[in-house]
């Protein structure tokens, strides 16, 4: 489970899921 932010399309572990702009996606597609 990785959080994706609108400002940062790249998966970042530092990004917290606290923001509402967080999406649950699998990194397998990357």
Swiss-Prot record:
Compartment list: Secreted
InterPro entries found in the cross-reference section: Snake_toxin-like_sf
Cellular component GO terms held in the UniProt record: extracellular region
Presence of keyword Secreted: yes
Gene Ontology terms, MF aspect: potassium channel regulator activity; toxin activity
Superkingdom per UniProt: Eukaryota
Tissue: Expressed by the venom gland.
Disulfide bonds: 3-22
Post-translational modification as stated in the protein's UniProt record: Contains 4 disulfide bonds.
Keyword line: Disulfide bond, Ion channel impairing toxin, Neurotoxin, Potassium channel impairing toxin, Secreted, Toxin, Voltage-gated potassium channel impairing toxin
Function: Blocks voltage-gated potassium channels (Kv). This is the slowly inactivating phase of potassium efflux which is blocked by this toxin.
Sequence similarity: Belongs to the three-finger toxin family. Short-chain subfamily. Orphan group XI sub-subfamily.
Protein name, UniProt field: Dendrotoxin B
Organism: Dendroaspis angusticeps (Eastern green mamba)
